[in-house]
Amino acid sequence: SRFVMNKAGIVDPMRMMPRLEPRSNEEPSVMCEIAVAAAKQAMEQANVTADDIDAVLVAASNMERAYPAMAIEVQAELGIKGFAFDMNVACSSATFGIQQAYDMVVSGNARRVLIVNPEICTGHLNFRDRDSHFIFGDVATAVVIESAKHCRSDHAFEILDTKLQTIYSNNI
């Protein structure tokens, strides 16, 4: 960002310091809203409905609010029965969510698990820090983990193996 070729928009304070409008407790949170949009796409691509999902995991580096659990909010918005919970493992949250879902499917605790990774980073970024502000953004991804015998999609991936590892670093 130090070598800007086209400065259009970069001096706009609303882009440099975006703000999320507060929502009432009766409204879905912003994280829930983007998570639901991603979840619907993943479910459509997997050819499954809310009735086919046994569990919802929301795995994110930070949560918009502490409670209720974001996963339960997403579960309610999608009309999914079963259970839901949040996971927070910083940058590795999505990876750990996939591992947890895989373990649940392999053990027989769930037939299908929806993992959603909504990230809202703009709320706590310093957009004036030209060395790092461009790395982070707001996004949501989702995936359905299921066994091959339950798979309904022609475009599925196979999980061949998994292994998790964490290493402490304060170099953020």
Residue locations for each model-derived region?
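Condensing-enzyme catalytic core mediating Claisen C-C bond formation in acyl metabolism
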Residues: S1, K40, E44, D129-I172
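Conserved "HGTGT" condensation-loop signature of ketosynthase/thiolase-family condensing enzymes
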Residues: S1-D54, L78, D161-I172
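Active-site nucleophile and cofactor-binding loops and adjacent substrate-binding regions
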Residues: E27-C32, V56, A84-A94, F134-F136
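Active-site-proximal alpha-helical scaffold in enzymes
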Residues: M31-Q45, N88-V116, V143-A148
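Short acidic capping loops at alpha-helix termini that bridge into adjacent secondary structure
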Residues: T49-A55, G82-F83, R111-R112
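Acidic, glycine-rich active-site loops and adjacent beta-strand->loop/helix elements
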Residues: A59-R65, V89-S93, N117-T122, K163-Q165
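A glycine- and small-aliphatic-rich helix-loop capping segment at beta-alpha/alpha-beta transitions
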Residues: A69-I80, Y102-S107, R130-I135
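Flexible, glycine-rich active-site loops centered on histidine and acidic residues
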Residues: G108-A140
